[in-house]
A protein has these predicted regions:
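Extended, highly charged
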Residues: 1-121
């Protein structure tokens, strides 16, 4: 199954049991990378409450790491087996797909819009 969005891919990882949630506060500066490194290649990790020096105290934006942490995950994201990966990359390079332009009204990136952003914490 080829996922068409990050949300879809996270759902697939959840269903496969390889997405772990960290619901406690984790500091971006050091803790998040340490946890991500420990899970590297085994699990994807979704941090629900990242905190940090440069983030607002009421930050609502989660952080995810390790979503293609090993060849098996990466192959599944591509919709092929591990053995088919190199062939799929070669095929994609030989036959590139043109980008699809979506109107700004229909773009999923506009689902969550914050009007007043404090860039200085």
């Amino acid at each position: 199954m080829v996922s068409r969005s990050l949300r879809e891919w996270l759902q697939v990882l959840e269903e496969d049991g390889v997405l772990k949630h960290v619901s406690k506060e984790v500091k971006l500066e050091h803790e998040l990378a340490a946890v991500g490194k420990k899970a590297c290649g085994t699990y994807a990790v979704l941090f629900d409450k990242p905190t940090g020096e440069h983030l607002p105290q009421d930050n609502q934006i989660p952080v995810v790491t390790g979503i293609c942490g090993n060849r098996s995950m990466f192959a599944k994201a591509m919709g092929v087996s591990v053995g088919e990966m190199s062939g799929r990359f070669s095929e994609a390079q030989a036959h590139p797909v043109a980008p699809v332009v979506i109107s700004s009204e229909a773009a999923p990136v506009k689902e969550v819009v914050t009007k007043q952003v404090n860039l200085y914490g």
